[in-house]
Amino acid sequence: MNSGDTIVSLSTPMGLGAISLIRCSGCQTNKIIETFFSKKFSTNEANYLKFKKGDQVLDDVIAIFYKSPKSYTGEDMLEIMCHGGSVVYQMLIREILTIDGCRLARPGEFSERSYTNNKMG
């Protein structure tokens, strides 16, 4: 099942950690990849990339793409590990949310999608 929208959320605690994890799940995941990364990457592999807005590099990140149905949610999913601190992850999330069909996830929504897509027992 695909709900028709793509959810985005910070998946690590807010604070001063060195690394923050942004998680995206849904039908616009490939659009996120095409918009912000200059190269395609394989499924289930960590990729060192530049998160770009046009020609401007916003951060150096590690990104992993999980192809549906072999992801936590059962949908296409992207995990972006960026530099920690609220300024960086807020900026990247704000840019991702400019893509039509992307929105902030509700609390527990990744798990809800996992359950709905029969990924949990």
Features from the language model and the residues they span:
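A glycine-rich (often HGG/GG-containing) alpha/beta subdomain
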Residues: M1-G121
